[in-house]
Amino acid sequence: LWPSSAASDVYKRQDVFSSLDYESHVHGQKSYNGVAIISKKKLDNVKTDIIKDKLKQSRIISAEVEHKKKKIQLINIYTPNGNPVDTPKYEYKKNWLDDLIKKLKSLSKTNKNIILAGDFNVIPAAEDVYNPKSFEDDALYRLEIRKKFREMLGLGFSDVYRHFNETKEGYTFWDYMRGAWQKNNGMRID
């Protein structure tokens, strides 16, 4: 989805390293991570530190936009992958998600107009991966990570894809190194 080919008012991207010709706010790094919010509408209160990231990785950006005289808080995230499990990477993912949930709880007390989007790096349910059994001990699908995702939904957020596609598979990622696209061995993590 690119501004030159669609008429959307707001764009959110992950793995972003430079800005486009809209009002854009980018929080990126040289070689990986990075998030942005790109909008036709004026963005206010842009922040990249709404949760404290001990590793200072570029994983979150938030902004407010006015729509129909209402302030909407936009939050774009790039959740840590967390693999391999039983390493500091997995602990970082769990702590990052805990911090995000804590912040979302706080924000949702005063603002009911929040749009949370991005790369969650979570496979929410069995129908969201081609072979759930093979991912049981993967950081994308471990039960404790899926519980954290459901905890976010419990704050009043909706899984928009599942809302419109209750049982339909719809993958967002295929491993490019193993011919996964051709075999449709995908997963929904975004």
Where are the predicted features?
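Single conserved hydrophobic/aromatic residue that forms the stacking wall/gate
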Residues: 1-7, 11
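Structured beta-strand-rich core segments of catalytic domains in phosphoester-bond hydrolases
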Residues: 9-84
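Metal-dependent phosphoesterases centered on the DNase I-like endonuclease/exonuclease/phosphatase
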Residues: 16-23, 96-189
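Short, surface-exposed beta-edge/turn micro-motifs
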Residues: 34, 189-190
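Surface-exposed cleft-lining segments at the edges of enzyme active sites
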Residues: 51, 79-97, 133-138
